[in-house]
Amino acid sequence: WDVQGYYGNPTSKLWLKSEGEAALGEGVEDAEVQALWSKAVAPYWDLQVGVRQDLAGETDTHAVVGIQGLAPYLFEIDAALFLSQRGDLTARIEAEVDQRITQKLILQPRVEVSLAAQDNPARKVGAGIDKIEAGLRLRYEIVPEFAPYIGIEQGWKLGDSARYTRLAGDDPSVTSVVIGVRFWF
């Protein structure tokens, strides 16, 4: 899942974000929730600060500083730095763009890159580029506020992260099918 919502005005907002992964027939593999205060710093760009709580595995708490906005050519960007209570520094950047096939059918390529400043074998994270995920989602906007989608995502663990994953008996390359609904009100 990947859920985002906010309350506020165009220049100052409280964002709540949550994302996680679970395989059919298995428990939750990875999950987090974030509470962020967001302040407009430029047209189409917000600076965000707040807290992130991991909900699966090691339940670390992180301070968050990030930026979210709309880059040229309508790329939606969400980039954040995370500092855990253990002193682990990580970062994540996500980018996506809507490509209209018809007025109602939209193809959305997306990419996410995760980085870590130091090794954390307990979380299967190596220093450097930890993980890259790339995917395509095809959605049909029944109305602009409601659009079911289906997609495919490919994720790769890299470097020491891939080594830690293999040592745990898991595959560092994972292909996933995603199904969901995008809605707003």
Predicted regions: what they are:
Residues 135-141, 171-185:
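Outer-membrane beta-barrel "beta-signal"
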Residues 1, 29-33, 59-63, 87-91, ...:
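Residues that define the transmembrane beta-barrel architecture of outer-membrane proteins
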Residues 1-26, 35-39:
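Outer-membrane beta-barrel initiation region
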Residues 16-20, 49-53, 79-83, 109-115, ...:
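Transmembrane beta-barrel strands of outer-membrane/channel proteins
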Residues 60-120:
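Detector for outer-membrane/organellar transmembrane beta-barrel domains
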